[in-house]
Amino acid sequence: MTMGVVLPSKVVSLVIRRPPHFTFKPGDYIFVNIPAIATFEWHPFTISSAPEQSDVISLHIRVVGHWTNKLYEYFESEQVNTN
């Protein structure tokens, strides 16, 4: 399960199912790949959810370049198509 929501200021809130036994501490990051945007590109993002949240991992990603702009456009079109 991956869910993305566009927020003001060109930010995407990305929520990913947390794998079993995945541990992290504040300040840790994960590499993200969205094949619909770029099949072989992985990008690092800081985890914004609390380690105590056991079911999902949250990321807040601001548009700063080509890939993050494509991410924003992808989830923006997903929101338009579901509304």
Where are these regions (language model features)?
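FNR-like FAD-binding dehydrogenase module
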Residues: 1-83
